[in-house]
């Protein structure tokens, strides 16, 4: 998910199917605050590979721009978005990242600006901080051409687009097939720098 400031509100861009579960989980951390956690059914995510609309996707500049607005008649984030995102090697959502099955750094969170090592406490901090400190992430989510797929490691396949999303051991990832933004991590350097 992505977080958006909206005046006094905070909007979270997440999969429609995951919104209910996310709202329930966030409610657990409300801690007696008088805040409302609710779904905004009328808003959908829109995107553009270029242009000035919305804001740059915080994960990777090449992903283009995103914004939240009412639906305009069709699927706002569609197969075009999926093809664009996978071509840049970025996995997202439950189908590709699982749900509570993978460690956060295995999902390339450090490389895609999804974690801060300077922030205080958060759920999962212990494992995430230890993996970063030890500079050891044994497995990674990678997007590879379907022709190079390892079915035993496959999390999602898109035959129409020619891509496979997989959870592979780092030594089994061919650097020639990985995106440039992941090269430093695969070369054995630190999985990320403070954001």
Model-derived features: positions:
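Basic, glycine/lysine-rich polyanion-binding surfaces/domains
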Residues: 1-195
């Amino acid at each position: 998910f992505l977080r958006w400031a909206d005046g006094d509100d905070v909007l979270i861009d997440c999969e429609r199917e995951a919104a209910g579960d996310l709202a329930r989980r966030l409610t657990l951390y409300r801690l007696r605050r008088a805040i409302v956690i609710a779904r905004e059914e009328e808003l959908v995510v829109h995107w553009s590979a270029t242009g000035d609309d919305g804001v740059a996707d915080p994960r990777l500049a090449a992903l283009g721009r995103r914004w939240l607005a009412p639906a305009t008649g069709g699927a706002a984030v569609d197969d075009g978005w999926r093809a664009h995102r996978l071509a840049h090697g970025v996995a997202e959502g439950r189908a590709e990242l699982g749900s509570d099955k993978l460690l956060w750094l295995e999902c390339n969170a450090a490389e895609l600006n999804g974690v801060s090592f300077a922030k205080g406490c958060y759920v999962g901090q212990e494992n995430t901080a230890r993996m970063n400190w030890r500079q050891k992430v044994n497995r990674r989510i990678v997007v590879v051409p379907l022709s190079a797929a390892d079915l035993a490691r496959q999390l999602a396949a898109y035959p129409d687009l020619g891509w496979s999303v997989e959870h592979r051991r780092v030594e089994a990832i061919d650097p020639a097939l990985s995106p440039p933004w992941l090269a430093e991590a695969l070369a054995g350097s630190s999985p990320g720098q403070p954001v």
